[in-house]
Amino acid sequence: MKAPLRRGLAALCALLAPAGCQAAPELAVVGDSVKVKEGADLPRRSALYAGGRVRLRAARGETLGVQVLLTHAVRGAIALDLHAKDVHIVAFRLDTVPVREPSTSMYGDSRGPGQYPDVLTPAPGGIEGQPRAYFDVAVGPAASPGRHTGELRIGSRRIPVELRIENARIDLRSDPLVWVYYMPGEVAAVHGLPDDDRPEQIEVEREYYELFRRHGALLAPHLGPHRFPPRRQFMKDVRFWPAWVDHSSDANIAADVRRWLELLDGSDVRAFSIPIDEPRTAEQRERVRHVAEVIGKAGGGRPSFLRAVTDAVHPVYGDSIDLYFSPLNIPEPANERRARGQLFWTYNGKPPHAGSMIIDTYGVALRTWGWIGYLYDVDLWYAWEGLYFRDRYNRGAEATDLLNDPVSFDERQKGGTDFGNGDGLLAYPGALPSLRLKALRRGLQDRLLLEQLEDCGQAAYARRVARALIPRALGEATGERAWPVHEAPWEEARHLVLDGIERHCPP
């Protein structure tokens, strides 16, 4: 192992150790994978702020998230400025939501009740009189590498800022790792529109689509072929697209498959269809197999129209399934079966397999997805859902008051026991991003940096850094989560990757 990497891994290991006893600070400047409940102590360690100076480091094409956290509301404005061309800063008001009941163990461990920061509202007029603020620092692909200076203003206080732009370059919008499912009717309802695919509805959906693409995710519905044409415009720079088929009869299955094949003829995009979600009984699995076989007879199947199931490999499926969504399949039997042409992806997350989507967990939770996706060669990660504004599975037509009660999925309404805060919700009505969506973006950008390092012939370097941070996940993981819950080790690992790119990858 080369000396720079060895020293870097030693520093990373030191950061994984518990912090010593220090007084809680009155100011913290942290990244987008930190989540501090209202009234809780601010982080004693920061990867961005030390010695009275904020230090930022970014690749070209990368967006950094910067949170400014105070123990009390400041008099005056909180503002961030940088003197650099092709660097754009967007300020957000960061508001909390009240978690009164901790999410159940179906989602992993909860950090308990409290006011959690999550709702981000653009603040073009500035942020006044608040105890917290959030900034996106977007470094353009043509930004000049080197050191650039700026200033963080907190009321009358001035803190110097340094931004180091690297030669590395990423493109977050192209070939997204994460597919985020949504129902067009949910978006239409919250905006007072009919669910009829008129231009007004598509334009509103585009706002949400663009929000997610800016964060490295594909927001796409799982609709039948008759509703695809108005949304074809969203199928850009992707390798895969969800394609629903009507499985109420064999004739309808075959008709939809043939229509999809016509619609996608001449495209490099591969369709995939999940006719039955999360089959649990023998009868449901038999039905999955039957639908898959009918799809195959109609001309579907790998490589162009993938028959998918959100389940682990099971003998009943035989060779009828082309694509499995389950963390339990990875790395095995995925590695053995990929030679047959089968694909193995994953969905959602729960420790120790992957971080959870819920509000009341650690800020790094969704950052794990990008790193895990890299380590285990996942082509697509399915997030159910992203815009679950109404708990239609449990409450029917009743809208969820998300800002006052973030329990978005509640099986107690129909006799169950599980419920989750923010489950299926990565953005709020009005196309407002959540802090969790920012953490997801952070991990997806980390993945692109790891891939760039690997493309420069440094796969062993990149994987050593990633394995030091996440020793095990997905189907390899049992017991407790294996990754750190604080941001500093993640940023140290990211810096090691950037160091490797600077040393080994030509500009």
What residue spans do the PLM features occupy?
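Bacterial N-terminal signal peptides that target proteins for export
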Residues: M1-L9
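Bacterial N-terminal signal peptides
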Residues: G8-A19
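Ligand-binding face of N-terminal immunoglobulin V-set domains in extracellular IgSF glycoproteins
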Residues: A24-R157
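An acidic-aromatic substrate-binding cleft motif
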Residues: I159-H247, L261-F272, D277, L306
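The substrate-binding groove and active-site-proximal loops of carbohydrate-active enzymes
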Residues: E186-E200, P242-N252, F272-R285, D322-P327, ...
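Acidic (Asp/Glu)-rich catalytic clusters
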Residues: F212-R213, F228-R239, D256-V269, I295-G301, ...
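Catalytic domains of carbohydrate-active enzymes that cleave complex glycans
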Residues: V257-A282, V294-D311, N394-P507
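Catalytic-core region of carbohydrate-active enzymes that cleave or remodel glycosidic bonds
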Residues: G318-S408
